[in-house]
Amino acid sequence: MNDFWQHCSALLERELTPQQYVTWIKPLAPVAFDASANTLSIAAPNRFKLDWVKSQFSGRITDLAREFWNTPIEVQFVLDPKAGMRSAPAGAAPAAPRAPLAPTGPAATVAAIAANLAANASAAPTAPADVPMTPSAAAAHHLNADDADIDLPSLPAHEAAAGRRTWRPGPGAAPAAGGEADSMYERSKLNPVLTFDNFVTGKANQLARAAAIQVADNPGISYNPLFLYGGVGLGKTHLIHAIGNQLLLDKAGARIRYIHAEQYVSDVVKAYQRKAFDDFKRYYHSLDLLLIDDIQFFSGKSRTQEEFFYAFEALVANKAQVIITSDTYPKEISGIDDRLISRFDSGLTVAIEPPELEMRVAILMRKAQSEGVNLSEDVAFFVAKHLRSNVRELEGALRKILAYSKFHGREISIELTKEALKDLLTVQNRQISVENIQKTVADFYNIKVADMYSKKRPANIARPRQIAMYLAKELTQKSLPEIGELFGGRDHTTVLHAVRKIADERSKDAQLNHELHVLEQTLKG
């Protein structure tokens, strides 16, 4: 029995992702084998794992048992809270002790950067105090404007009054390494909390994380620009901050800037108003790494787009890295100049999808641990099964549970969780699915639901299918590739064409607009 389980576990570990294996298979344990009845009993530590393993993995485990014993075997799954404690197969070598982990978190990140700066400071000669800085070096050194809401270099009062923009080092001696590390965070606008170490990885984001690590290791060389897109709360901002934090660790003094697209637009306007645009340009063109978040906010801002285009060209020409995020695929962003879209496409574009079940559980468990709370797996699975959209929603739900538990003086249980999330769970139960959209549209236009997946192209089928794709994009959080997959494995460009076509026709066709309104109200209940 134990030999079989060792064999079975090894095969499943190769077939599954690490997170799937650790979450579902590793906690299982064989507890009994009846050779006369050809039955094998496998224990799971809780009800959620038991139900999930039975529905997802029982067939594969049964097949492996039949192959191992060369006879049909009935695999039974039983509940045993102690299963996880004895899941290692008999005879297996004990795991080697892991080396202690280095401290993580913002304090550790700042400390590492400070040490890096101190090493560089001791090795490099100090520049004479009266040597003027070059414009590009000064632009990288100063980030604070005379007006607090625009990121341009500060000026001595007499120069500001004279309207001159002379660049020079800040007064006084160089700060200590720790102070310089803090100052670097202030200038770069990076959040030291957001690192690769505390980024939970799963199927939904593993490609994006791999690309981010590659860029952090080889900035300006691999994937320039890197364009990450996906819905809100899926970890795009976390990843780009992680890249910036990693580069600060690897390269003390790197010129890095994180900025939200809305702030960039605002700063462009203010730079023009204050006749400080040369300084603005000089600063952005001198960066080593530019992280710009939610670039869809550039939509319709032609002057901002023009200036960003020139900044982009200058940075890439200088082998500086550009990283961009958006809530949607680049070609789907309306109101963006074609020149910019082509530049976005010249690097690597990666989607971040909503987290799968195992990843949602891992996020909840890790977040609870960071709050000093020991969250049971039963509760984590319950929440993860009911809340599926994004990380922020999961973290918000966990905060509600913790607050409810503290206020009522009760331990966290599934019952308490249901009470704490009552309103949220009600909303989730009414959530619109692509499958429901397909059925509703098919009924409305009197076609078969199967026509939504078929390759048929008659107008009486193709048009309702395009309408269903449009509604799926408007009413769900699915990405274009996900929607395409749910419509018979179609390419995301087919979905994009349908969405744009129906959106354009809706603005011109009153009858179509009325039909869409009726469908939307039906779906929203």
Curated annotation (Swiss-Prot):
GO terms for biological process: DNA replication initiation; regulation of DNA replication. Domain I is involved in oligomerization and binding regulators, domain II is flexibile and of varying length in different bacteria, domain III forms the AAA+ region, while domain IV binds dsDNA. CDD domains: AAA, Bac_DnaA_C. Residues 161-180 are annotated as: Disordered. Residues 1-71 are annotated as: Domain I, interacts with DnaA modulators. This is Chromosomal replication initiator protein DnaA. It is found in: Cytoplasm. Residues 406-525 are annotated as: Domain IV, binds dsDNA. Residues 189-405 are annotated as: Domain III, AAA+ region. GO terms for cellular component: cytoplasm; plasma membrane. Belongs to the DnaA family. It comes from Burkholderia lata (strain ATCC 17760 / DSM 23089 / LMG 22485 / NCIMB 9086 / R18194 / 383). Plays an essential role in the initiation and regulation of chromosomal replication. ATP-DnaA binds to the origin of replication (oriC) to initiate formation of the DNA replication initiation complex once per cell cycle. Binds the DnaA box (a 9 base pair repeat at the origin) and separates the double-stranded (ds)DNA. Forms a right-handed helical filament on oriC DNA; dsDNA binds to the exterior of the filament while single-stranded (ss)DNA is stabiized in the filament's interior. One of its GO terms (molecular function) is DNA replication origin binding. Residues 71-188 are annotated as: Domain II. Keywords: ATP-binding, Cytoplasm, DNA replication, DNA-binding, Lipid-binding, Nucleotide-binding. Residues 168-180 have a biased composition (Low complexity). Oligomerizes as a right-handed, spiral filament on DNA at oriC. It holds the Pfam family DnaA_N. InterPro entries: AAA+_ATPase (IPR003593), Chromosome_initiator_DnaA (IPR001957), Chromosome_initiator_DnaA-like (IPR020591), Chromosome_initiator_DnaA_CS (IPR018312), DnaA_C (IPR013159), DnaA_dom (IPR013317), DnaA_N_dom (IPR024633), DnaA_N_sf (IPR038454). ATP binds at G233, G235, K236, T237. Its main location: cytoplasm.
